[in-house]
Amino acid sequence: MFTAIDKIDRTFTVDQEFACLSSSTSSDSIGENSDDDEGGENEIESSYNGPLDMMESLEEALPIKRAISKFYKGKSKSFMSLSETSSLPVKDLTKPENLYSRRRRNLLSHRICSRGGISKKPFKSVLAMSQREGDSSSSGDDSLPTLRQHHKTLTPRLRKGSFGNCVPVVDSPRCFQTAAGRNIHNIIC
């Protein structure tokens, strides 16, 4: 014995399937059951059928994602504690080094060595300040110190440490090449 709701649902599905078969639209999935499709190319079923309430069971059920993007060559995994990392080999944990990161690290350490520490604010070069002072002292104002005295008072003190022998920024102007190919003489950096 069928109820009225069953008859309506069955009638609707039969009419819907008949309409899909008789129509000449390009969409094949309207009105068809996608579970009956045997050519499921993009569907993946997990062999795990248990509850997913624990993190370990969830990790087992999910497929392992090998890379974040096509440029990332390593594996990505989060750790709750450092003791979990002891079982993995070091090569799986380290990020491979490329030329850009090595050059950036070398320039950063050289900049720290030249300035005598990490500075968050850019400072004016001693040479530029002494040239401005020298221009104003040549105008006849004797109250300002001469260029040589000013240079001696503003020369940064050098510290010997893990960076080896450092040279003041003023004594070693460097030439950098920009992306456009122009040379820039940089005294501060």
From Swiss-Prot:
InterPro entries: OxStress_Response_Reg. Keywords: Nucleus. Residues 22-49, 128-147 are annotated as: Disordered. Residues 33-44 have a biased composition (Acidic residues). It comes from the Eukaryota. Transmembrane segments: none annotated. It is found in: Nucleus. GO terms for biological process: response to oxidative stress. GO terms for cellular component: nucleus; plant-type vacuole. PANTHER family: OS08G0516900 PROTEIN, PROTEIN OXIDATIVE STRESS 3 LIKE 2. This is Protein OXIDATIVE STRESS 3 LIKE 2. The lineage of its organism: Eukaryota, Viridiplantae, Streptophyta, Embryophyta, Tracheophyta. The gene is O3L2.
